[in-house]
């Protein structure tokens, strides 16, 4: 889902929004 993609992207960046 879109949420998962967004979650992974932020996690990889190291900045949880």
Curated annotation (Swiss-Prot):
GO cellular component, one term: cytoplasm
GO biological process: gluconeogenesis; glycolytic process
Reactions catalysed: D-glyceraldehyde 3-phosphate = dihydroxyacetone phosphate
Location of the protein in the cell: Cytoplasm
Upregulation: By water stress.
GO MF entry, a single one: triose-phosphate isomerase activity
Keyword terms: Cytoplasm, Gluconeogenesis, Glycolysis, Isomerase, Stress response
Principal place of residence: cytoplasm
Further remarks about this protein from its record: In plants, there are two types of TPIS, cytosolic and plastid.
Subunit structure: Homodimer.
Identification of the protein by name: Triosephosphate isomerase, cytosolic
């Amino acid at each position: 889902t879109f949420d998962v993609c967004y979650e992974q992207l932020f996690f990889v960046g190291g900045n949880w929004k």
